[in-house]
């Protein structure tokens, strides 16, 4: 089925913000091309949060634009602006500056030798101030200072009387140094302030003791854990609600209730390990054994399913029995955190592949429009901007409580929009049931690279749950990849009158499609056709599959009426996505990428995409995890050796399994055994495979990665697959830090030195010069 534009009203906002007549309200209201104020349209419940900019005066254009201006010209402008501001500041505070240097001794007319100064920084500063003062004296702006010997002596004596005796082992300051230090303390505000009392300054004004006002008992106590990666202040919101109010707000109808429904709830958890005093513990099926642990940790109330046997010894103050706790968990969490998604514009991205990269691109696009945008993906969680939260295992296994609590934290810290992955697994389990999505994005649908348990129809229906919520033509949008054969099914979900923006690489009838693209080892260039004009994009994201992700993000920008220049800038800002075909660039002559592909299908598609970049050779490092999916080990080797010129087998989280046993299983993919491989190694030479490709192995991953990188030559592409963004290695019971990306960067520092030393790294083991 072919689509041109699937919206019933195929009209978009123009680049200048003017619109043709249309009957629906866009997700983003029209705004000036030069404006950086973005307002997200909303239904009635959202209008108070996002005022209409049409009610205000039109925004003023900036003084100058940096579009098309070189970096050097930008720096020139900034320097000129800084000089102008400095001159204005001097004129404004002229008297203050003059009085500040009035007490400095006049500088001697003759300069001092460098040897005499001894390189003393403070002497240099004093001399500079004195020279400046002398200049003002010559200009008649200041009067010469009278001799200060008498006054200094008097002040010094007073200071000595107040200080009392000084211990012998401490060097005494001379009188002038004491005065200077006192004045410095006073000028810089370093004089001691009482922890208890306010004080009165020299002018008679009462000053508030900030240490007393914002002491250790203040609610904003300093804690590095409260800071994002960029060290912006991240404030943890506090919530509380009585149990009866929570049940009423969430519309949960209990089967029976015991205890005090007026008990105050200060948190909600369904994992007993995270319970704190005052929390409500929602005991889901399968976690009944953790009731006692939750009780010991201070849970004041419990919500449990009727199938669970509740012990009489529980010390909680209230017990609520419901039909199914899994069904009510999302509603309870959303109500407790005050429905945060209703006050943000939320973009959900579903599909089998491309979700993570697409979320990164959309986040960057929104921020290019001036919108504070959070992100929730399998790789990272961002409040907004580069304020990254450290949430170990949270993003990999999100639950309804975590989703709502993170959204509440984002909203509390000024986030205006949120882009999040909505995987079929999460949608099927109801983890996103209480998220109020505004835009639904569909990337693609395959079953080869997923852990979803169910039929193909169930898998497709799970993804379609996101689109079934697109019912409001004024607020909702659908963004669909029509190269996928399931596109029509997703378009038909929800209200058919909701506008749809389509994208594709093969179907030129899509609203967003490439007119031309060029792939290389280091960048991707694509010319994109859109209803609003043609975009020229240069991206550091490599491969054909990333063009799909770029098109999806562009389609979202078109759907919300974003200015074209913001779309381009937002997409181009994303140079790499952690562990997703991530380019490691140390200015070497060959490419190195790290990717998370750890399944036969994922590895096959990755290597096909790399081959399309036309490298001279592909050198692939791959391993298989221990105690997990032994059946895929031969397949991984077979695919790697068929689609790579050189393959290096290694370990990947062996756990309690012998790495050599894992490698033996992998070698069976080419009909070899470990004994046969080692027999070849007796002569330090491993013959080519039947297809002419080479195969090596090493059970230590760090060694394998560094050797593969050292093999790289101009025009090659080294592919390190399996871990991606994961920064650990599981060996036995130990979890040790390890990062493929850091190992690649480290190895690249020595490649030139190895080659200059005459070491032949094309073979394994390496050949020293004398053995060539």
Curated annotation (Swiss-Prot):
It is found in: Plastid, Chloroplast. The keyword Lipid biosynthesis does not apply. HAMAP family: MurE (MF_00208). Belongs to the MurCDEF family. MurE subfamily. Residues 42-87, 141-168 are annotated as: Disordered. Residues 54-63, 158-168 have a biased composition (Acidic residues). Disruption phenotype: Albino phenotype and seedling lethality under normal growth conditions. The modification Phosphoserine is found at residue 194. The gene is MURE. Residues 1-40 form a transit peptide. One of its GO terms (molecular function) is ATP binding. Pfam families: Mur_ligase, Mur_ligase_C, Mur_ligase_M. It comes from the Eukaryota. Keywords: Chloroplast, Phosphoprotein, Plastid, Transcription, Transcription regulation, Transit peptide. Expressed in leaves and flowers. Involved in chloroplast biogenesis. Required for thylakoid membrane development. Seems to be required for plastid-encoded plastid RNA polymerase (PEP)-dependent gene expression. This is UDP-N-acetylmuramoyl-L-alanyl-D-glutamate--2,6-diaminopimelate ligase MurE homolog, chloroplastic. GO terms for biological process: biosynthetic process; cell division; chloroplast fission; chloroplast organization; regulation of cell shape. Component of the plastid-encoded plastid RNA polymerase (PEP) complex.
């Amino acid at each position: 089925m072919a689509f041109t534009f699937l919206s019933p009203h195929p009209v978009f906002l123009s680049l200048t913000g003017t619109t043709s007549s249309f009957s629906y309200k866009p997700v983003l209201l029209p705004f000036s091309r030069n404006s950086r104020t973005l307002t997200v349209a909303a239904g009635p419940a959202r209008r108070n949060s996002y005022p209409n900019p049409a009610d205000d005066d039109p925004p003023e254009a900036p003084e100058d634009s940096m579009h098309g201006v070189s970096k050097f010209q930008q720096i020139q402008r900034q320097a000129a602006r800084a000089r102008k501001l400095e001159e204005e500041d001097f004129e404004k505070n002229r008297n203050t500056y003059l009085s500040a240097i009035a007490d400095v001794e006049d500088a001697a007319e003759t300069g001092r030798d460098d040897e005499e100064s001894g390189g003393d920084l403070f002497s240099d500063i004093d001399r500079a101030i004195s020279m400046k003062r002398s200049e003002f004296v010559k200009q008649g702006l200041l009067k010469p200072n009278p001799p200060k010997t008498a006054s200094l002596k008097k002040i010094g004596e007073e200071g000595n009387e107040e200080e009392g005796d000084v211990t012998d082992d401490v060097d005494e300051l001379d009188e002038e140094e004491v005065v200077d230090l006192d004045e410095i303390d006073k000028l810089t505000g370093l004089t001691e302030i009482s922890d208890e009392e306010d004080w009165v300054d020299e002018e008679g004004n009462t000053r508030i003791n900030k240490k007393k006002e914002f002491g250790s008992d203040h609610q904003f106590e300093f804690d590095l854990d409260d800071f994002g990666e960029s060290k912006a202040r991240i404030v943890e919101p506090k919530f509380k609600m009585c149990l009866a109010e929570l049940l009423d707000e969430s519309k949960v109808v209990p089967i029976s209730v015991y205890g005090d429904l007026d008990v105050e709830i200060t948190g909600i958890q369904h994992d007993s390990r995270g319970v704190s005093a005052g929390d409500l513990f929602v005991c889901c099926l399968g976690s009944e054994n953790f009731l006692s642990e939750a009780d010991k940790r201070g849970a004041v109330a419990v919500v449990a399913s009727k199938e669970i046997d509740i012990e009489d010894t529980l010390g909680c103050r209230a017990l609520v029995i419901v039909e199914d706790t899994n069904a009510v968990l999302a509603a309870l969490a959303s109500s407790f955190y005050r429905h945060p998604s209703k006050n943000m514009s939320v973009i959900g991205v579903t599909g089998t592949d491309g979700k993570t990269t697409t979320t990164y691109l959309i986040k960057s696009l929104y921020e290019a429009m001036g919108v504070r945008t959070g992100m929730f993906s399998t790789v990272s969680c961002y409040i907004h901007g580069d304020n990254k939260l450290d949430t170990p295992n949270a993003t990999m296994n999100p639950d309804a409580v975590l989703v709502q609590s993170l959204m509440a934290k984002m909203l509390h810290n000024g986030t205006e929009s949120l882009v999040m992955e909505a995987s079929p697994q999460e949608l099927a389990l109801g983890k996103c049931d209480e998220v109020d999505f505004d835009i639904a994005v569909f990337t693609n649908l395959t079953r080869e690279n997923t852990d979803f348990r169910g039929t193909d129809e169930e898998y497709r229906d799970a993804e379609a749950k996101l689109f079934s919520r697109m019912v409001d033509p004024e607020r909702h949008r659908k963004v669909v990849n029509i190269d996928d054969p399931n596109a029509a099914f997703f378009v038909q979900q929800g209200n058919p009158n909701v506008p749809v923006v389509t994208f594709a690489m093969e179907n030129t009838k899509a609203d967003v499609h490439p007119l031309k693209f060029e792939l290389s080892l280091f960048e991707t260039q694509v010319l994109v056709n859109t209803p609003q004009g043609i975009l020229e994009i240069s991206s550091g994201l490599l491969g054909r599959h990333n063009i799909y992700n770029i098109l999806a993000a562009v389609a979202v920008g078109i759907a919300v009426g974003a200015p074209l220049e913001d779309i381009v800038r937002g997409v181009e800002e994303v140079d790499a996505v952690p562990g997703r075909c991530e380019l490691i660039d140390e200015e070497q002559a060959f490419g190195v990428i790290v990717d998370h592909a750890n399944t036969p299908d994922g590895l096959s598609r990755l290597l096909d995409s790399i081959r399309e970049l036309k490298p001279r050779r592909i050198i692939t490092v791959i391993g298989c995890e221990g105690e997990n999916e032994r059946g895929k080990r031969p397949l991984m080797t077979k695919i790697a050796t068929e689609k790579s010129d050189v393959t290096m087998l290694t370990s990947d989280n062996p756990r309690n399994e012998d790495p050599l046993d894992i490698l033996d299983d992998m070698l069976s993919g080419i009909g070899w055994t470990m004994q046969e491989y080692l027999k070849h190694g007796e002569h330090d030479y491993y013959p080519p495979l039947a297809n002419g490709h080479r195969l090596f192995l090493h059970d230590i991953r760090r060694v394998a990665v560094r050797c593969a990188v050292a093999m790289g030559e101009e025009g090659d592409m080294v592919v390190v697959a399996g871990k991606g963004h994961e920064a650990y290695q599981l060996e036995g019971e130990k979890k040790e830090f390890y990062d493929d990306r850091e190992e690649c960067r480290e190895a690249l520092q020595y490649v030139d030195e190895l080659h200059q030393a005459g070491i032949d790294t094309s073979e394994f083991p390496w050949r020293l010069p004398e053995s060539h």
